[in-house]
């Protein structure tokens, strides 16, 4: 059966790797990059363990360690490179030939009807020649509960060249597997299936296609679209079913790929579709802006964006078809991977030596969880894929700028050092250490937020400093839970018709909160047994009082700003989604 599948499978022509992407003596370069990573890790560890103090002031109980200084410099460098990249992109006006064919693929699973309608409408009005653009929606599910998505597709694209098909299986399951609900272990497509022939015929002859197939996860849905397209299109654009595209999103990404043949993939600026649903969704909207316009912009400066986001990304199809089978059949610790689809796609492009870029000139709005539990499940799912893909990405560091190695090491060790710092200070027998820890966290957060305010030109980014508490109390413990459950998979938060019932991520949060409360209680207990009449303790009490007052005033100010500005003003003005080309310069809440 495998021989037959291999014989009938369409083998795409390998585009090859351009000579200017290949490094001479790759073994030597590997050794250089890995040695740099080891030295970097050793340097960070030594700076942390030795607790070498750069600046101390006993009168104000202040100290700045070498590790803290290094992390501050890292943020400064990241911010600088992000600014340079954004400025370069804004000053460059790339041409578009409008000759390249694009397949806009949408992955859907039990989507909220309102979000799906937004998505399909925006896809319909994308400004790109119709004879060069193909729209494909693949639905993960073929039951009556999933039929509403196909009906909506028919309604939106009524009058266009539409083709639909309800598939009893998918590329990796036959009719027999569909009936008993089992999951096959083979990773090769079943080319003799009649459904495959129908699907590929529809995709290659119709402009707008909707396929309902047996449930198999998001990766199976994306595979169906990619495999059915084959080599008939130049570029493949990815989009989620909860995403509203800017009308020029496709054009702007095509421009980037046309401008540089060494660029294998490009991503755009993803914003939040529902920022004012809750505090969680609002903070996610600020975090998204930072993630794309600072972190990804910095990576783009060095041509090594680590993840092309699923809601808004574009790949060269000839490259994608080369690693399509390997991407779908990815295994980790003997288990097939169903998480991290977008990150692994990006890593596959990077593994071939191609560049990955980010452009803020195209934008999309995507739904984000507004409930804490669903948001936590989403973050846990993303963290699992991050740690797994980090190991894969490390194999190809030597093919790219050394910044990718540096940033990978820093981001990997950061949670562990933060955890150790928090525990060490909480159990250091003095409540001043607790207050100083809280002040340091917020001071660094405010500095980063002030930079974001300047870069975005919007003071609302000052509220981004509140995200540090979400990180410390929620994301940090979830990272350890993600590592322990790294092989557990599923759609996670992607289905929006059902309430998330996975409460397991709450367990590490409970343990972490117990550790934090225990540390605070221990510090208070130890301080209660100290002699506060001594001059040293009187000085500490003085700083403790003013530290607590400053910290309290900060939270009062931020809460007031959030309540008045966001809950009252911005929420009333933001009744519709504003896209990139609809934003007037005078608008306050960008």
Curated annotation (Swiss-Prot):
It holds the Pfam family Glyco_tranf_2_3. Residues 53-60, 423-425, 478-505, 565-588 are extracellular. GO terms for cellular component: membrane. Its EC number is 2.4.1.212. It is found in: Membrane. Its cofactor is Mg(2+). Disulfide bonds: none annotated. Gene3D superfamilies: Spore Coat Polysaccharide Biosynthesis Protein SpsA, Chain A. Pathway: Glycan biosynthesis; hyaluronan biosynthesis. It is an enzyme of class 2 (transferase). Keywords: Glycosyltransferase, Membrane, Transferase, Transmembrane, Transmembrane helix. Catalyzes the addition of GlcNAc or GlcUA monosaccharides to the nascent hyaluronan polymer. Therefore, it is essential to hyaluronan synthesis a major component of most extracellular matrices that has a structural role in tissues architectures and regulates cell adhesion, migration and differentiation. Also able to catalyze the synthesis of chito-oligosaccharide depending on the substrate. Belongs to the NodC/HAS family. This is Hyaluronan synthase 1. The gene is has1.
